[in-house]
Regions:
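A glycine- and charged-residue-rich anion-binding loop/surface
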Residues: 1-189
């Protein structure tokens, strides 16, 4: 009502019926999307998005090895063209640390490690040492993705079947995201 009133003062007309229709469509899409499964913010499950999603697990593992166990994923954003990965770390990465991280991810890719999906109770996954970013978003039964001895994480997927499918990993940029959080932008070639 307020919107219509303000629009009227400006000589504009509001398509109330059109708005109601679009709002109802949005509500229905939201209902369909909330099936109780957490997808980790991945909007699309195309081939490249799937590859980048698996690459985030390898990058997380490599960062822990290069920078230390204080590293934890803080977020990610994946498109068909690139990946963005936010992680806890107090300082800018050196060129050597970036090179070591990139080389380690590429080593994991060349190792052709099978990617296994395991289903189990959330508490059992945590006892196994599986990492979980948004633990409250998962149900009682979770999917855990195991990439050899490299990575073990709760995740909604999707993932490639083998790390060899990823191609070559390249860090394009490393920058501050917020206090104590760094951001890596990377591509697969």
């Amino acid at each position: 009502e307020l919107t219509e009133e303000l629009a009227g003062e400006l000589g504009l007309k509001v398509d109330t019926e059109g708005f109601k229709q679009k709002f109802a469509e949005h509500q229905e899409k939201s209902r369909q999307g909330s099936t109780g499964k957490f997808k980790g913010g991945l909007a699309s499950t195309g081939e490249m998005e799937t590859k980048y999603h698996t690459a985030t697990h390898l990058l997380n593992a490599a960062l822990k090895k290069v920078l230390g166990p204080h590293v934890h994923q803080k977020g990610s954003n994946i498109t068909a063209e690139r990946m963005r990965f936010d992680f806890s770390h107090p300082a800018k990465m050196t060129d050597e640390e970036k090179k070591q991280t990139e080389d380690l991810v590429n080593e994991y890719i060349k190792m052709a490690i099978p990617v296994e999906k395991l289903e189990m109770k959330k508490e059992d996954a945590l006892k196994m040492g599986a990492e979980a970013m948004f633990i409250d978003k998962y149900g009682d039964i979770v999917s855990v993705y195991k990439i050899g001895d490299v990575s073990l994480e709760l995740c909604g997927g999707p993932h490639v079947k083998n790390t060899s499918e990823l191609g070559h990993f390249k860090i394009k940029k490393e920058e501050a995201s917020s206090a104590g959080v760094r951001r890596i932008k990377a591509i697969l070639e």
